């Protein structure tokens, strides 16, 4: 009788274990499907989310107070993916990584400043373009670089470096451009501390966890990028919802302004890379890295330190840069396919 009880317990434990494995397997299969969906239709998903938030603002506006927390999770997820190899890649091609950061932090804030002047936006909206330009590269740039057959290690390294430089350089360039031309009170230290809390601390925590227990939390690491992508979409939706009236008032002009700032990043980086004879794969990565900003960070900082109107540029730019990034990647792949056919 005693042996039968033991056998029965063993059978139940084995059955529970098998059911657990099956559930995990199904869950991971769903996550992989969602990842594939995001990678294949990111631009359309972003547009759909923005349209829904614009048409149904009350459904999404309640999430606005939680934007900073969602962005912290996105940065934490980024930290979990960073390995020693990423930092080694920085030293393998240091001049290219440095060049990306130089172009990004020198040109994009200036482009935002010029766009705000050219389109004669009020200070509350104009400062959003400067803030957007002063932010580091967005994580979506790594995906777009992959789709464009670009230098992915360079893209990941450049995103990491620009993100780590952001606590100093982002508030510095916002103060430099916006502080000199706007009546809005802009202080360096509060913005510096916000970026440290929102960006630096979560990334460092992710890196530390990955270093010490990375092998034990592989399922968590697999899930985090998907949840992070959903978080970015929710941030976009929340900002679009809370600024629905402002977007309606500015209308088409705000989209044109964001497009000009975004495309200028591609164009300026292209000519710099051509002048320095940088290879095509690296040039593509650098163009995407400069042109695609961390719009979610600009939105979070705008809401915390300025007004909801300052977040409009970041919300619209999020739609624009995903579309232009997809188009650019498609052009690059088509060019490569044609070259293969010609050389066959």
Outline where the language-model segments fall.
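Short, positively charged and aromatic/hydrophobic N-terminal segments
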Residues: 2, 11, 15-21
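Alpha-helical transmembrane segments of multi-pass small-molecule/ion transporters
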Residues: 11, 23-344
